C-alpha cells in the first residue's frame, strides 16, 4: 500500500474513511501538509453542505415491507412457546427467556433489513446518510424510527416481555406509549447526576496519574498482544492494536523464521500490516503497565505520541494527557441514556443454519452431552471443539458436497445424529466469547401444577416407586411421556331422574343428559312466566284461587320516576297498593294500606299503645306491621331548649304550673302541666311541660293499681 496508490479514492467518505484519510496523510506527508489538507476538507464539506442541505421529512422514513412477515413469524414462534408452556413442557422462566430472545432476534433481523432496504431503494436517503455518516445519530435510533422499538425495561430494570412492535413512523398504541414512557423518565432523571460525575472523574484521574515521560529505556520484560476476538468474530484486528507500540522481542516469520521486526523498533502502520499478513498470531510488545522506570514511564514502554505519530518527547506530561483523554468522553457518554431511553438490546448467539437439504452426521469423536437449553428445549452441549457433517440429499445422479459446520466449545446443537434437515433450518448456536463455560449447575425440584380439574391419564409414562430408609415412598418416571388431564364437569342428578345417555356416549354442549317428571298437588290454571330470550325458564305457575274487588278503580301517580298505584273503593276510601302489578302475593299478605290523615299530631310528645300488637321484624325506619288492632294515644309535650345558667330558672322540677306561667326568664309555657327540668354542670339544658290535669285523691291506695293504664274521657276511677 504505497502512498501513490492511495491518492485517488473513489468511495463514500464517512467518519471511518475520514479518520483513515487523515492518519494516512499524517504517516506519509507529515503534520504541516495534513493540517492544510484538513482545512481544505473542511471547506469542501461546508461548501456542499450549504449547497445541498440534507432535509428530512416523514416520507424519508421508509418502513421495510418485510417487517410484517418478520413480526408474524415471531408471533407464531411465541404462540408455539405459549402452547409448550401450557402443556407443562417448559417452565415460566424458560418461556419468558424464549419470548425475550425471540423478540430480540426479530428486532436485530429487522435492523439489518432496514439497512438493506435503504441501500437497495435509496442510498442517498437523508436518514441513511445521517445514520451512517458517523456525525450524528446511529443505526439504533433509525431502528426505532422505521424498524421496531423492541423490548423495554420497567422502572426496576426488569425487561417487559411485551415488545413495542411499532416504530415512531407508524405511531405507538396506548399500551406501547405507557411502556415506552418508562425509559424516557429514566433518561431524564439520571442525566444531571452523571454530568457532574464525569467532571469529577477527570479531576481524580489527573490527580493520580501525573506521570511524565523520562529516560529512553528501562529494559523491562514485556507484554504479549493478540487480536481481540469474540467467538469467530474479530472485534479489533492485530494490526490496529500494534500500531504505535514498540516491539518487545524479535518477531519471526512463522514459516521462513526470518526476523520481520527487531526488538525496540516502533511499529508503524506498514509494519503492523506486514506482521498481520505474515500470519503471526501473537506479538510481544512494551507497555506502560510493565514499565520499570523509577518515577515515570520510559520512551520505549510508552511508544508513539498520537499527536504527531512518532515517538514521545522527553518530559511530556503523558499521565495528565491520558487522564484528560479518558475524562473527556465521559461528558458525552452521559447523553447516551437521554437519547435511546431504556431500549433493551441483548447479545444474540451466532446462529448456524443449514445451506442444503440433508441428513445430520455427528462424528464419534465429537464430545457432546444432552442438555436443556434456557428455552426448555432438548439439545446437545458441545464440550470440545469439533466438526459436524451434513450429508446432502441426492438430486438425480448428482451428489452435492457435504457441508461442514465447525463447532466451538460451549455451542448448542439443536439437531441429533441422523436427523433430516431442510435448507435454512437452525442447526446450532455457536457461543460467542464469555458464555462458554457453564460449570455451576444446581438441582432444583419444580412443581408442575394443573390448570384444570379432571381425571389423570398417563401416556407413555411408566411410574416407578422407590422407598427410602425413612419409609417414604416416592414415585418417579422411568421414561419420557405425557400426563393428560381429562377435564370435565360433574352433575348431580335429582332423585327419580331418568337418564337419556349411555356410558361412553359423546355429547355436544347443551345436550340433554336426563329427564325428570313434575306432578302438581293443586288443580288450577297453568301459566308460564315470560322467559327472557335465550334462557329457558325454571318455573311453572299454577293459579289456584283469585279474588275480585268490586267497584274499585286503580289510578297511577308517578313522582320522581316511581309509579304509585292508588286504589279507590266504593265507600270513598283511598288505599296505597303495596303489591304492584305482576308481583306474587302470599296467603294473608297485606296488599294495600289505607291513606288517612285523621291521626296527625299537632305537637311533639310520646306515643302509647293500648292493646295494639306489632310484628317486630324489619327496621323501625320502615315501620312495623300491625298484627292486632287497639288504641293509640299520643301524649303531647311542650319542650323549651334553653342552654343558659341555672339561676334563670323560675320554677322547680316536678312543679305543676298553669298555662301562661313564666318558667324561665322571658319564656312562658302554653299549657298547664308538670315541669321536668334537665340540667348539667349548672347549665339549664331543657324545660319540658307535660300537660294534663292534676287531681287530688283522698285514698291513694285505691288508685295505685291503675298506674300506667289508659283512662277514657269521663271514666270513673
Swiss-Prot record:
The keyword Electron transport belongs to this UniProt entry's keyword annotation: no
Gene Ontology biological process terms from the UniProt entry: DNA-templated transcription
GO cellular component, one term: DNA-directed RNA polymerase complex
Gene3D superfamilies per the UniProt record, alphabetical: 1.10.132.30, RNA polymerase Rpb1, domain 3
Broad EC category: transferase
Classification via InterPro entries: DNA-dir_RpoC2_beta_pp, DNA-dir_RpoC_beta_prime, RNA_pol_Rpb1_3, RNA_pol_Rpb1_3_sf, RNA_pol_Rpb1_4, RNA_pol_Rpb1_5, Rpb1_funnel_sf
EC numbers, comma separated: 2.7.7.6
Residues annotated for Zn(2+) binding in this entry: 218, 291, 298, 301
SUBUNIT field: In cyanobacteria the RNAP catalytic core is composed of 2 alpha, 1 beta, 1 beta', 1 gamma and 1 omega subunit. When a sigma factor is associated with the core the holoenzyme is formed, which can initiate transcription.
UniProt-listed NCBIfam families: rpoC2_cyan
Entry protein name: DNA-directed RNA polymerase subunit beta'
Organism: Nostoc commune
Amino acid at each position: 500500500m504505497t502512498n501513490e496508490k492511495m491518492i485517488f479514492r473513489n468511495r463514500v467518505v464517512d467518519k471511518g474513511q475520514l479518520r483513515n484519510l487523515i492518519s494516512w496523510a499524517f504517516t506519509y506527508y507529515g503534520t504541516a501538509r495534513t493540517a492544510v489538507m484538513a482545512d481544505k476538507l473542511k471547506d469542501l464539506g461546508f461548501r456542499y453542505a450549504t449547497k445541498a442541505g440534507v432535509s428530512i421529512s416523514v416520507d424519508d422514513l421508509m418502513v421495510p415491507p418485510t417487517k410484517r412477515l418478520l413480526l408474524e413469524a415471531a408471533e407464531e414462534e411465541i404462540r408455539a412457546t405459549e402452547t409448550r408452556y401450557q402443556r407443562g413442557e417448559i417452565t415460566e422462566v424458560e418461556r419468558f427467556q424464549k419470548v425475550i430472545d425471540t423478540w430480540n432476534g426479530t428486532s436485530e433481523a429487522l435492523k439489518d433489513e432496514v439497512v438493506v432496504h435503504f441501500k437497495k431503494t435509496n442510498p442517498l436517503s437523508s436518514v441513511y446518510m445521517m445514520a451512517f455518516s458517523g456525525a450524528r445519530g446511529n443505526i439504533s435510533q433509525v431502528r426505532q424510527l422505521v424498524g421496531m422499538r423492541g423490548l423495554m425495561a420497567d422502572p426496576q430494570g426488569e425487561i417487559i416481555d411485551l415488545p413495542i412492535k411499532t416504530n415512531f413512523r407508524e405511531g405507538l398504541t396506548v399500551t406501547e406509549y405507557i411502556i415506552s414512557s418508562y425509559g424516557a423518565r429514566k433518561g431524564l432523571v439520571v442525566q444531571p447526576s452523571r454530568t457532574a460525575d464525569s467532571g469529577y472523574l477527570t479531576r481524580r484521574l489527573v490527580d493520580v496519574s501525573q506521570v511524565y515521560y523520562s529516560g529512553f529505556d528501562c529494559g523491562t520484560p514485556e507484554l504479549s498482544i493478540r487480536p481481540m476476538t469474540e467467538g469467530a468474530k474479530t472485534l479489533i484486528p492485530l494490526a490496529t492494536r500494534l500500531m504505535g507500540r514498540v516491539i518487545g522481542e524479535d518477531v519471526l516469520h512463522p514459516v521462513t523464521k526470518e526476523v520481520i521486526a527487531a526488538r525496540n523498533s516502533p511499529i508503524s502502520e506498514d509494519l503492523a500490516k506486514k506482521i498481520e499478513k505474515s500470519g503471526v498470531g501473537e506479538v510481544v510488545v512494551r507497555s506502560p503497565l510493565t514499565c520499570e522506570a523509577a518515577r515515570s514511564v520510559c520512551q520505549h514502554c510508552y511508544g508513539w505520541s498520537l499527536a504527531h505519530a512518532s515517538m514521545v518527547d522527553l518530559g511530556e506530561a503523558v499521565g495528565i494527557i491520558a487522564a484528560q483523554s479518558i475524562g473527556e468522553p465521559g461528558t458525552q457518554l452521559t447523553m447516551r441514556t437521554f437519547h435511546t431511553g431504556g431500549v433493551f438490546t441483548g447479545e444474540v448467539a451466532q446462529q448456524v443454519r443449514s445451506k442444503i437439504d440433508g441428513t445430520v452426521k455427528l462424528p464419534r469423536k465429537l464430545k457432546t452431552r444432552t442438555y436443556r437449553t434456557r428455552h426448555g428445549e432438548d439439545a446437545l452441549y458441545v464440550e470440545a471443539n469439533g466438526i459436524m457433517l451434513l450429508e446432502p440429499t441426492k438430486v438425480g445422479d448428482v451428489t452435492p458436497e457435504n457441508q461442514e459446520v465447525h463447532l466451538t466449545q460451549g455451542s448448542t446443537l439443536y439437531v441429533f445424529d441422523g436427523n433430516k434437515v431442510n435448507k435454512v433450518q437452525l442447526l446450532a448456536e455457536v457461543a460467542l466469547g464469555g458464555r462458554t463455560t457453564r460449570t455451576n449447575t444446581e438441582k432444583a425440584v419444580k412443581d408442575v401444577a394443573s390448570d384444570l380439574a379432571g381425571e389423570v391419564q398417563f401416556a407413555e409414562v411408566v411410574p416407578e416407586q422407590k422407598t427410602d430408609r425413612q419409609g417414604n415412598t416416592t414415585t418417579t418416571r422411568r421414561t419420557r411421556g405425557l400426563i393428560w388431564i381429562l377435564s370435565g364437569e360433574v352433575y348431580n342428578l335429582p332423585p327419580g331422574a331418568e337418564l337419556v345417555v349411555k356410558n361412553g356416549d359423546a355429547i355436544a354442549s347443551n345436550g340433554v343428559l336426563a329427564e325428570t317428571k313434575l306432578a302438581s298437588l293443586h288443580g288450577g290454571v297453568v301459566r308460564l312466566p315470560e322467559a327472557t330470550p335465550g334462557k329457558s325458564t325454571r318455573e311453572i305457575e299454577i293459579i289456584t284461587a283469585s279474588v275480585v274487588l268490586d267497584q274499585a278503580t286503580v289510578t297511577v301517580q308517578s313522582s320522581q320516576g316511581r309509579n304509585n298505584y292508588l286504589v279507590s273503593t266504593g265507600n270513598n276510601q283511598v288505599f296505597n297498593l303495596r303489591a304492584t302489578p305482576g308481583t306474587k302475593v302470599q296467603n294473608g299478605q297485606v296488599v294495600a294500606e289505607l291513606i288517612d290523615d285523621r291521626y296527625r299530631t299537632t305537637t311533639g310528645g310520646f306515643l302509647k299503645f293500648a292493646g295494639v300488637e306489632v310484628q317486630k321484624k324489619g327496621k323501625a325506619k320502615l315501620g312495623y306491621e300491625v298484627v292486632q288492632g287497639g288504641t293509640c294515644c299520643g301524649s303531647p309535650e311542650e319542650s323549651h331548649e334553653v342552654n343558659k345558667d341555672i339561676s334563670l330558672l323560675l320554677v322547680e322540677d316536678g312543679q305543676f304550673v298553669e298555662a301562661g306561667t313564666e318558667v324561665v326568664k322571658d319564656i312562658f309555657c302554653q299549657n298547664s302541666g308538670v315541669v321536668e327540668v334537665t340540667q348539667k354542670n349548672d347549665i339549664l339544658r331543657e324545660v319540658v311541660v307535660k300537660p294534663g290535669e292534676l287531681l287530688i285523691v283522698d285514698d291513694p291506695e285505691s288508685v295505685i293499681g291503675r298506674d300506667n293504664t289508659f283512662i277514657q274521657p269521663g271514666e270513673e276511677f
